[in-house]
Amino acid sequence: MGRPPCCDKIGIKKGPWTPEEDIILVSYIQEHGPGNWRSVPTNTGLLRCSKSCRLRWTNYLRPGIKRGNFTPHEEGMIIHLQALLGNKWASIASYLPQRTDNDIKNYWNTHLKKKLNKSDSDERSRSENIALQTSSTRNTINHRSTYASSTENISRLLEGWMRASPKSSTSTTFLEHKMQNRTNNFIDHHSDQFPYEQLQGSWEEGHSKGINGDDDQGIKNSENNNGDDVHHEDGDHEDDDDHNATPPLTFIEKWLLEETSTTGGQMEEMSHLMELSNML
């Protein structure tokens, strides 16, 4: 089971040290030096165990012990040594001769441990914020690249359309030239069938007939006006019929009507070709 602690022996005093006990211990250490702690209680007559005497001297009575706040340099050393050695406070205190292991342990538990936890939390939050900013930046870059690629695609389509547009204009010019040729051929064909002298003679003949018809109509109207009252109404009725009757069509008018109907069909064909050219 091992050796029982010396503090559990009968007659060993526990609890706070008195000023008289401190004076006896300091006087003995100054005379004999620190060491051989097992003989200290017997040689001094103190009712304390050897471990209690050593800790009292090391943590409170030895000269050069520094009290008060820890400097930033001391804090850094404690943090570094605690990460390497763990909670071995006596070993850590050996690197800080002016600080006791008890003071180092208390300062670690009350200040440094909480400070490190807060620093780790802040560092974690900062890392998360950086990660979020990085992801948002990547998303922005991806969006810009997508927009650039779409813009490039549109530019390529426009470039292809500009290349294809001269072909469509060429086809439109070809259709217009073709329609112009058809119109010229149509005019030449009918001018061959109806010479200018024949058309002029037909027009003069129709015009003279129209004038003679008007003279005959005037004579008839005067005769009807000079008749008796019985025939007056009949004469008026005949005048109205003659006035509303459609005069006979001359040769030139018939030809113009035929040309108009034929030209209407040609114009429909031309409009259809123009629509096809616009679609191309």
Swiss-Prot record:
Residues 37-61, 89-112 bind DNA. Transmembrane segments: none annotated. Residues 118-127 have a biased composition (Basic and acidic residues). It comes from the Eukaryota. GO terms for molecular function: DNA-binding transcription factor activity; transcription cis-regulatory region binding. One of its GO terms (biological process) is response to UV. Induction: Induced by jasmonic acid (JA) and salicylic acid (SA). Triggered by auxin (IAA) in roots. Stimulated by light, UV-light and cold. According to PubMed:16005291 and PubMed:23828545, rapidly repressed by abscisic acid (ABA) in an ABI1-dependent manner. But in contrast, according to PubMed:21637967, transiently induced by ABA in seedlings. Rapidly repressed by drought. Activated by white light, but repressed by blue light and darkness. Transiently induced by salt (NaCl) in seedlings. Induced by sucrose. Positively regulated by SCAP1. Disruption phenotype: Constitutive reduction of stomatal opening and decreased wilting under water stress conditions resulting in abnormally turgid and green leaves as well as an enhanced tolerance to drought, and associated with an altered expression of some genes (e.g. ERD10, ERD13, NHL3, SYP122, VPEgamma, ERF and ZAT genes) mainly involved in response to stress. Normal stomatal closure in the dark and upon abscisic acid (ABA) exposure. SUPFAM superfamilies: Homeodomain-like (SSF46689). Residues 118-149, 204-247 are annotated as: Disordered. One of its GO terms (cellular component) is nucleus. SMART domains: SANT. Residues 128-149 have a biased composition (Polar residues). Residues 9-65, 66-116 form the HTH myb-type domain. Mediates the inhibition of anthocyanin (e.g. cyanidin and delphinidin) biosynthesis when expressed in lettuce L.sativa and could thus be used for the development of new varieties of lettuce. Promoter triggering guard cells-specific expression can be used in tobacco (N.tabacum) and tomato (S.lycopersicum) to monitor stomata genetic engineering. The modification S-nitrosocysteine is found at C49, C53. Specifically expressed in guard cells. Present in seedlings, leaves, stems and flowers. InterPro entries: Homeodomain-like_sf, Myb_dom, Myb_TF_plants, SANT/Myb. Keywords: DNA-binding, Nucleus, Repeat, S-nitrosylation, Transcription, Transcription regulation. The keyword Transport does not apply. Transcription factor involved in the regulation of gene (e.g. drought-regulated and flavonoid biosynthetic genes) expression and stomatal movements leading to negative regulation of responses to drought and responses to other physiological stimuli (e.g. light). Promotes guard cell deflation in response to water deficit. Triggers root growth upon osmotic stress (e.g. mannitol containing medium). This is Transcription factor MYB60.
